[in-house]
């Protein structure tokens, strides 16, 4: 019997059974998934719900007609708005509506105050309010400022009017009353100052004595006032009204004249002070071993009080040859003394002209004479920096013609410092006889004496 069955009929039966099974299925609708399909660890990427994936048929994004509401897995307190606000009623306005109402009432209360201020400044009679109330707001719109309310004047006095506006008619004053109310006090001060510039420009003689600002010199005829610091026999203060193009030339011509009349001590650097005090006839010559000293930064010559003289020099009498000499001064060698040879510094000791008699001495050597300003340009700190080095000695001599000549003794050999006699014997200007014991003099005292002696020599030469 099995062999008699047709295979085609068996295939047809199988197809019919499958179709019947499909028909017997329930229609597509919301159905609860089996418990084994729900997995809280899974999350759908389409809808964001937990318990299924994006491929699952439970996803509401795939079946819009029968979308399932994702059930909450647990209570989420604090995230959901369980107590929403009740709808507001107009009878019970909130705090925001109250603030808006107060802001609307404030400008209405300020309107009468603005009207009173406008009436006080302008002097106009108060306008009658219209029945609809539109005219009052339009008239005061130009006075409203966004920055803040109008200033309230507590005093009953009327505002002070500038003198420039005093000559105008009363109609113009009443029209510009509101403009003056908005002007700041600084603006009024500038107007008053500009109005008072007219009569001041006419005063030429009195303007020279009164202190004027720098802007006043830019007029048509500026006043040039030249006031030298010290009185001069030739002329004094002059007031010359000239054009603005000649002022610079006169100032440049007047400044050097005022500087030439100043004394040599008034806060000037050392080279000009030395040239004024020593004069043109002074000549400073040094010994054969001396070289041109290196110039240091110029320092102002300040007069210090005289200090008590220190102990005498330790110079043996047998080492000095010849007649009377000036007091030799101890000098510390500069930093380059070992390489460049001996050099001079302004810490030189000498005696006053009254103590040093004029005696015939040997003529000075034909060495190039250094200017007198060179001695003052040396730094005073170079000598104090080398305490362990051997001191240098300079001899000052008074010649017959009233000039001074100085000679620098040769530096001693550093190998035998115990023999000062051999060191002094090498100098061609050393004499055999010795004067009274020499004492050390501060350099400030010596420089002051040198200025006095040179000024006396200049006066003697002028008398001759």
UniProtKB/Swiss-Prot annotation:
<dbReference type="InterPro" id="IPR039213">
    <property type="entry name" value="FAM90"/>
</dbReference>
<feature type="compositionally biased region" description="Basic and acidic residues">
    <location>
        <begin position="74"/>
        <end position="89"/>
    </location>
</feature>
<feature type="compositionally biased region" description="Basic and acidic residues">
    <location>
        <begin position="97"/>
        <end position="114"/>
    </location>
</feature>
<dbReference type="Pfam" id="PF15288">
    <property type="entry name" value="zf-CCHC_6"/>
</dbReference>
<protein>
    <recommendedName>
        <fullName>Protein FAM90A18</fullName>
    </recommendedName>
</protein>
<comment type="similarity">
    <text>Belongs to the FAM90 family.</text>
</comment>
<dbReference type="InterPro" id="IPR041670">
    <property type="entry name" value="Znf-CCHC_6"/>
</dbReference>
<feature type="compositionally biased region" description="Low complexity">
    <location>
        <begin position="180"/>
        <end position="197"/>
    </location>
</feature>
<feature type="region of interest" description="Disordered">
    <location>
        <begin position="1"/>
        <end position="42"/>
    </location>
</feature>
<feature type="region of interest" description="Disordered">
    <location>
        <begin position="415"/>
        <end position="437"/>
    </location>
</feature>
<feature type="region of interest" description="Disordered">
    <location>
        <begin position="70"/>
        <end position="387"/>
    </location>
</feature>
């Amino acid at each position: 019997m099995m062999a008699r069955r047709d295979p085609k009929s068996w295939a047809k039966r199988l197809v019919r059974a499958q179709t019947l099974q499909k028909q017997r299925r329930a229609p597509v609708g919301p159905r609860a998934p089996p418990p084994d399909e729900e997995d809280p660890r899974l999350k759908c990427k389409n809808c964001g719900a937990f318990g299924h994936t994006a491929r699952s048929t439970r996803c509401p994004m795939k079946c819009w007609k029968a979308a399932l509401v994702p059930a909450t897995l647990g209570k989420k307190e604090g995230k959901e708005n369980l107590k929403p606000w009740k709808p507001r009623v107009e009878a019970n306005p909130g705090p925001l509506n109250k603030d808006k109402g107060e802001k609307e009432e404030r400008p209405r209360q300020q309107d009468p105050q603005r009207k009173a201020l406008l009436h006080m400044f302008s002097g106009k009679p108060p306008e009658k309010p219209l029945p609809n109330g539109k005219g009052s707001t339009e008239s005061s719109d130009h006075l409203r400022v966004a920055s803040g309310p109008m200033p309230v004047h507590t005093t009953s006095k009327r505002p002070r009017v500038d003198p420039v506006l005093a000559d105008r008619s009363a109609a113009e004053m009443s029209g510009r009353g509101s403009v003056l109310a908005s002007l700041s006090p600084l603006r009024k001060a500038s107007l008053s100052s500009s109005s008072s510039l007219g009569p001041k420009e006419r005063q030429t003689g009195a303007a020279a004595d009164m202190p004027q600002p720098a802007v006043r010199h830019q007029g048509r005829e500026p006043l040039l006032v030249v006031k030298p610091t010290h009185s001069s026999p030739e002329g004094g203060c002059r007031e010359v009204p000239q054009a603005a193009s000649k002022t610079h030339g006169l100032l440049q011509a007047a400044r050097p004249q005022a500087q030439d009349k100043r004394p040599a001590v008034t806060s000037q650097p050392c080279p000009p002070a030395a040239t004024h005090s020593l004069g043109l006839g002074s000549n400073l010559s040094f010994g054969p071993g001396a070289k041109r000293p290196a110039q240091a930064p110029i320092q102002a010559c300040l007069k210090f009080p005289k200090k008590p003289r220190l102990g005498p020099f330790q110079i043996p009498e047998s080492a000095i040859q010849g007649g009377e000499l000036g007091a030799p001064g101890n000098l510390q060698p500069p930093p380059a003394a070992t390489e460049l040879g001996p050099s001079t510094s302004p810490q030189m000791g000498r005696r006053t002209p009254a103590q040093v008699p004029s005696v015939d001495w040997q003529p000075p050597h034909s060495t190039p004479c250094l200017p007198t300003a060179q001695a003052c340009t040396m730094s005073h700190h170079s000598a104090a920096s080398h305490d362990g080095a051997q001191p240098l000695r300079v001899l000052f001599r008074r010649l017959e013609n009233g000039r001074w000549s100085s000679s620098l003794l040769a530096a001693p050999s550093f190998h035998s410092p115990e023999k000062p006699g051999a060191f002094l014997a090498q100098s061609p200007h050393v004499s055999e006889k010795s004067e009274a014991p020499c004492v050390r003099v501060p350099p400030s005292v010596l420089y002051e004496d040198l200025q006095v002696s040179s000024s006396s020599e200049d006066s003697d030469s002028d008398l001759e």
